[in-house]
Amino acid sequence: MGEIERPRSLSRITVHSDAEYLDAYDHVTYSNSLELLDTIAETQITLNLFMNNKFELAEERMAELYDKSMYHSMGYTCILFIKAVMTVNKQDMEKAAEASKLSCEIIEKFRERRSIKETIFGASAKGKKMTDEELHAELCYAQSLLIRAMLTFFHDDNFASFIKGALNIRTCYQTYRYCEKLMNEPSVWVGRNKKVQEQFESGTRMGLGTFSLMLSVLPSKVLRLLEVVGFSGDKVAGMRDLHHVASMTGTLCSPLAKMVLLTWHLIISFVLGTGQPDLEVCKRLMPGLTHLWPRGAIMLFMKARLLLISGDIEAAIHYFNMSIESQDVYKQFHHGCYWELLFAHGYQRRWSHSANYARLLMKESKWSRCVYTYLLCIFFAADETVEEGRRNETINALAGKVDGLRIRIAGKSIPVEKYCGRKAKRFTTTNSLLFAHYEFIYFWNGFDIFGKNSKMVRGIVEDMDRVWEMKKSTCDIDDYCLYYFLKGVALRHLSLHAQAEECFKIVLERESSIKSFTYLPPNATYELAMLRISEQQFMEAQTLLDKARAYKSYSLENKLHFRIHSAMGTMGCRTPMM
């Protein structure tokens, strides 16, 4: 398959000067002060180091007082956690898990001892007697517990560890709620330094706001069960808290809250919803963060995502490449960019470029070789510039590997890997991967990203029509329905509602004949509902969404349930319990 190369940016934009950005922290003097506000200031400096790609220096700075300061301990554990999640390396996971355990023990020493009764009912009475360190220890403890829980999910894939992680998350949430009681009790803050209060408030609001936001994406059936045990998933309240923290200039959590908001609008709203970000909010938040971290890999990535979603794909490609070139310490940051570049080139039907990035991921990343191999297979199949005999030989070899590369987490198969395995298995019997590349782009919200670019969408419709005319005589009913489903999606984004509806009805009328692609009818029903929402026929839309949700046991079922929940939310409805 030849030597792996990374395609250069195809952008019309002139590349910035190669002069390396020199920030204020290239030459640092460590502070050994253990005063609370000094340790918070050190953590703020470390955050800037990390976000400006000074990863090793940031880790070294936090390790200096790791066993003496709760903020250093929390910061050090957070850095190790990020590294472990990126590398998926067993040694990194074990190191982060051990640091997380020790961090909780260190922070525990700073906490005020209290009974359960005092935790629930006596926040004000107890709080005003607490020292500044004891107050902030509650905050640090909640954060460290969350990291420990997440590491448990990643590190141990058994059911007992899953339960342990869930209990840690519940304790973490309860601790944040206790911090909220302290934050809202005026007597607690009488006579204290204003900065101590502001740092505490920003951390508490950010923790609760992030929790509320993430819980709000869960289907009502799950959320209502969680509410019984004390969780709350109010999206409006979560957004309000995060925007409040973002405005608290000078606090440790202000830039972090801005990053959470950007991540929500630019990534999570697509992964766990219908892709309806508030781009105006993103455009307001971006300048302040790019001023803080102008050449940081993470900020360049976020800027690229904003450009991608705004429709400037060439500029997005340019900034993804800039993110890659900005640092070489954490190679795993590159993999996130490769993933995005794979799709960015796919949107423009540069299949050889997409295949190249899939090949890079398959070679370098440990996250899911099953998915990467499948992507290489389908993009290679779509690339008509490759000689047919060589293409078929490569596709057959790749498709045969996909199912055997699946992994399990907590004893469970990963839904997207199961989907890829089934599609690859079907190829071995039908010799067809017709429109598999467009289908994957659909499931990963590609049409929501480029849907407003009518020229691009029309190009995809023309390409599908051309290929269909060549292949339709040898296609089965599943391929037939997939063609009309994807064409319907494209026509919906072109606002050709009557034609789109006809395509979805063609799929639904043949539901009983579909053998493998049983996920098409529920997704076609959902797409019909989205048509009705755009026509403001909300009652009919809700009926269709309920019907789509009633389907069971098909590939990527949870992904559709998240979309249904998000669509219900746009109409002010909650998904039913049953």
Curated annotation (Swiss-Prot):
Family matches, as SMART domains: TPR
Entry keyword set: Repeat, TPR repeat
Positions annotated as TPR repeat: 297-330, 481-514, 522-554
SUPFAM superfamilies in the cross-refs: HCP-like (SSF81901), TPR-like (SSF48452)
PANTHER family linked to this entry: TETRATRICOPEPTIDE REPEAT PROTEIN 39 FAMILY MEMBER (PTHR31859), TETRATRICOPEPTIDE REPEAT PROTEIN 39B (PTHR31859:SF9)
Name of the protein this chain belongs to: Tetratricopeptide repeat protein ttc-39B
Organism per entry: Caenorhabditis elegans
Designated gene of the protein: ttc-39B
